[in-house]
């Protein structure tokens, strides 16, 4: 799937990304600080992997790494569908402190990729559906495409990236 950009300050608060950023700055000139950074990166990657697994997307051989200096996540493994692969990328990227996701998941059932939308202040799923599909009443398509990460159609926030599937 490739590389996706995200808004670093938006998203789930799974780990202390400011602490990791400070450790990354210190690690440039200090070996013990580098060891601390490695531990923080591993803990962040584990938190992201646990979040992905909690979504029950059917991914096997999941491997997640995080680089606190750049805010980059790399995710590898086997996804059963294109939808699952895209949802994993969103699980990784819609986390505070993550700026980019390199999605290297292999997909068992490849399909066309979805479009993506960055939520801005004032957006609603109805407004987004009107923009992409020409019909505000098609917001459930977007909601379903972003479940289980979205628990309710009204629980979107500025900076969040959403999947916009092709119109069925």
Question: Where are each of the predicted segments found?
Answer:
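Secretory N-termini
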Residues: 1-107, 155
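Serine/threonine-biased, Pro/acidic-interspersed low-complexity stretches characteristic
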Residues: 5-11, 131, 161-165
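Primarily a LysM-type cell-wall glycan-binding module
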Residues: 69-74, 79, 108-136, 140
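Extracellular LysM carbohydrate-binding repeats and other cell-envelope/extracellular binding modules
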Residues: 91, 95-112, 140-168
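Extracytoplasmic/periplasmic, Sec-exported soluble proteins
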Residues: 36, 40, 80, 117-120, ...
